[in-house]
Amino acid sequence: MPTAFYLFFSGMYQDTPGNFMRDYLLSMTAFSMMSTAIFSFPTVLETDRLNNWQKVLRHTPVSMVEYYLIKVAGLFVDFLLSIGVVFTVGHVVRHVNMPIQDWVLAAFLLILGSLAFVAIGLVLTLLPSSQLMSVAGNLLYMGLAVMGGLWMPISVFPEWMQAIGKCLPTYQLMELIKTFLNKGQVNGFASLYLTLFTLVLFTLVIVYRRHSEVRA
């Protein structure tokens, strides 16, 4: 779906000056990766839980840390596939061109920044039912995409919506990447924001899981 969105919307703005086509390519790549992290990843974990696979693992030499690392590794393979597909379409169909080092840097930052989406996916697994997880996932997915500026620049929104958008990880991830590509500099605020956002959510999940195990 993100690839189709990119082809459709970028086709409407092909004559837009500046780096619009490049930036929109990066936005749709992030959109694709977020879909995997917020939908596919929690669903896999929830399926394992419902099938009691996670309980079975506790009686094997495989630790839960190793279990999650394996799942995250598989998720990053999906991320690489998303990057490869969307980047290829952007380059071949929309003629987006960058130096090879910029393609690699953009891919690296997308993967690094996507840890924030992975953290969101893990938080969703804390919800008490699959139905609630699905509803919350859909709301977060669309909200982060639209309000965070992945579909359109947040400058088209009223000021109060722009203020909200700038507080979202999707917006800060794109700011991080664009600052690197445009200025060759580290966006300190975006880096700090994404790091703290990810660490807070990971900590929340760990604390909740440990508390649940103690109660069990």
Residue ranges and their predicted role:
Residues M1-D15, R22-S40, L80, Y141-A145, ...:
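Hydrophobic alpha-helical transmembrane segments of multi-pass membrane transport/permease proteins
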Residues P2, Y6-G11, L81, Q101, ...:
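Alpha-helical transmembrane segments of multi-pass membrane transporters/translocases
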Residues F9, L127-C167, Y171:
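Transmembrane helix segments
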Residues Q14-V44, F108-L126, T179:
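Hydrophobic alpha-helical transmembrane segments of membrane proteins
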